[in-house]
Amino acid sequence: MHLTIRHQTRYRYEGAGSLAVQRLRLTPADNPAQIVHSWAIEAPGMDNAATYIDGLGNIVHLISQAEPDEELVITASGNVTTTDTGGVLGTLDEMANPTIFLRPTELTRSSVEIDAMAEAVRLSDPLEMVHALMAAIAEQVAYVTDSSHAGTSAAQAFAAGTGVCQDHAHIFIAACRQHAIPARYVTGYMYVVDADQAVAHHAWAEANLSNLGWVGFDPANRQCPTEHYVRQACGFDAPSAAPIVGTRRCSGREHLDVNVVIQQQQ
């Protein structure tokens, strides 16, 4: 599938600032499920950006503005061809050992209830078991828009029985740890047929299975990633995989608008 993506993030500030710095994980990389034909980021400071690949294989740009305006617009766009691999990515080009993803964060720390759910689907076949985990999470945690916030943990969302894609991914990561399976948070895009505009950035998870390598799972949609998905970055949880992380020296409030448009090209 040939997809054209345009992802614009607009920050509005109440008052001018004296310094702003952003770390961007907005550039997707080639992998067995996608080929990135072109990709560009437009933002103040991109001409002097520091660009590097971090230990998890993410393409990162570090930009800054010495005298930032009251509005900051960051636009990422490009063309990607995707293939349905059943979610299987295998061994990717990254320095990190998969076992580091057995380490919990505050957002992916498990609970007695999550551990019990994970134990209830313990099976001898790891792939079958992780599929069962995905189904159990989707069944027990309903997708409800605006039912959580950026700081909601896996344990809190599971106890509430509601969440969004971020919460489903965090719970999945915590549940996999109960079976000693490394799992991580993934950000990217999901193309929805008959929808010209995506609601927002999407998130899912990946589990590392000894015979397959990294395999994607999207509990929010009860499926493994298909050719409708474009993988952008990964991390231990939502904050560590966020597409934009920034700081600004400013006394006023911040207002954020995100617009994502994904179109299929014939």
Regions found by a protein language model. Name each.
Residues 46-53, 65-67, 81-84, 114-122, ...:
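Noncatalytic linker/hinge segments flanking ATPase motor cores
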Residues 135, 167-252:
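Hydrophobic/aromatic-rich core segments of domains that either
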Residues 1-4, 32-41, 144-146, 164-169, ...:
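A broad, low-specificity signal for short, low-complexity segments enriched in glycine/proline
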Residues 1-116:
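Linear, non-domain "peripheral" regions
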Residues 89-90, 96-163, 171, 179, ...:
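Secondary-structure boundary elements
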Residues 1, 7, 22, 39, ...:
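Structural beta-strand/beta-sheet cores of well-ordered domains, especially the beta-sheet scaffolds
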